[in-house]
């Protein structure tokens, strides 16, 4: 079992604070905010698959935005009333990493949701590296693109 210090060393201070203590990276500073390469996004802590570039869009909010997870079962939703707001927190299912929040102001044609996710909680796996990195089963997501 990885200790907190080992995890912090492996993923970095910001990713640790975001995933383990529900911190939020500053808007427009994350690596994946204005990033639209073909591939998948996984939990930086556990490597579990979360989102696809096919469902990513530019919401202008300053954080990566997705219309949905690859499969709904991959994330869990939790009520969040911190900072005097009522929001829905999104966590990874296996590791329980804080990812961000989901809002109901996303593109109507894509289901109306906006998963506003911290770049620091994610690791991007480029399409051409998915098989090598152990994510070959998800290559079929891109068959029709």
Swiss-Prot record:
Keywords: Oxidoreductase. It is an enzyme of class 1 (oxidoreductase). The keyword Oxidoreductase applies. GO terms for molecular function: peptide-methionine (R)-S-oxide reductase activity. Pfam families: SelR. Disulfide bonds: none annotated. The active site is at 116 (nucleophile). One of its GO terms (biological process) is protein repair. GO terms for cellular component: cytoplasm. Residues 4-127 form the MsrB domain. SUPFAM superfamilies: Mss4-like (SSF51316). It catalyses: L-methionyl-[protein] + [thioredoxin]-disulfide + H2O = L-methionyl-(R)-S-oxide-[protein] + [thioredoxin]-dithiol. Transmembrane segments: none annotated. Its EC number is 1.8.4.12. PROSITE patterns: MSRB (PS51790). Belongs to the MsrB Met sulfoxide reductase family. NCBIfam families: peptide-methionine (R)-S-oxide reductase MsrB. This is Peptide methionine sulfoxide reductase MsrB. It comes from Streptococcus pyogenes serotype M3 (strain ATCC BAA-595 / MGAS315). The gene is msrB.
